[in-house]
């Protein structure tokens, strides 16, 4: 009788970060926005036919400077936000389209649905985009956004944040997330930020002040890397 040695145990997968719930009770409107039907898988080959192809003629360098899109300077604290887009193994992802949008320094968005009684800034639209370079790096110049009320519950205020959107090799791979600023006193009260229940994952959504990125007498600098996949993935809104 031949006794076979036991099979080696399969290597344990790295634990995945706790990502936001689709339906988070503390975030009232998530009940309306969360999926109610099964996921629809696109036909094979669709992503290859309709995948995004971006080049230097599609994204202008000025698109990454949100303070230079109008005739005058916007109001508020000028900032530089930069970092790298990495895969789960830490390898840089080049030529990735990175889009951002945000409120102005008073906490107001320019769209008609924003009812916050704060002033609009005629010199600030609050949207930009760029392509990552060969090191996977992106860079934006902007104004630090203000906090704003959002009527989710009594005395509800959103911490200052910038929305980020990233495209992979197909439009179906789009990821959306939010970047926050260090030391914000509103973190403890924000159900969107706290929908990410893993504290380490929440910390990955917070940029780090960086004196080397800061430009003398011009702008404060922040570093924020975005990791797509793996145990160290940046939490996203669409998982």
What are these regions (language model features)?
Residues 2-239:
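Beta-strand-dominated extracellular/periplasmic modules and repeats
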């Amino acid at each position: 009788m031949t006794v076979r040695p036991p099979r080696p145990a399969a290597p344990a997968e790295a634990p995945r970060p706790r990502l936001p719930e689709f339906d988070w009770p503390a975030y009232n409107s998530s009940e309306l926005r969360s999926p109610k039907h099964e996921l629809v898988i696109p036909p094979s080959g669709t992503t290859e036919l309709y995948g995004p192809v971006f080049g230097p003629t599609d994204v202008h360098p000025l698109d990454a400077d949100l303070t230079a899109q109008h005739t005058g300077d916007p109001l508020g604290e000028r900032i530089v936000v930069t970092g790298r887009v990495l895969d789960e193994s830490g390898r840089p992802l080049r030529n990735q389209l990175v889009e951002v949008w945000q409120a102005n320094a008073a906490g107001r968005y320019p769209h008609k649905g924003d009812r916050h009684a704060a002033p609009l800034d005629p010199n600030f639209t609050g949207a930009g985009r760029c392509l990552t370079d060969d090191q996977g790096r992106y860079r934006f110049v902007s104004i630090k956004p203000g906090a704003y009320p959002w009527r989710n519950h009594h005395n509800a205020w959103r911490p200052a944040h910038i929305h980020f959107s990233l495209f992979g090799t197909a439009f179906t791979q789009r990821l959306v997330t939010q970047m926050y600023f260090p030391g914000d006193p509103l973190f403890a009260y924000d159900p969107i930020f706290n929908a990410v229940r893993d504290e380490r994952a929440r910390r990955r959504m917070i940029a780090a002040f960086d004196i080397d990125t800061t430009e003398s007498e011009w702008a404060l600098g922040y570093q924020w890397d975005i990791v797509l996949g793996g145990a160290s993935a940046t939490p996203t809104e669409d998982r």
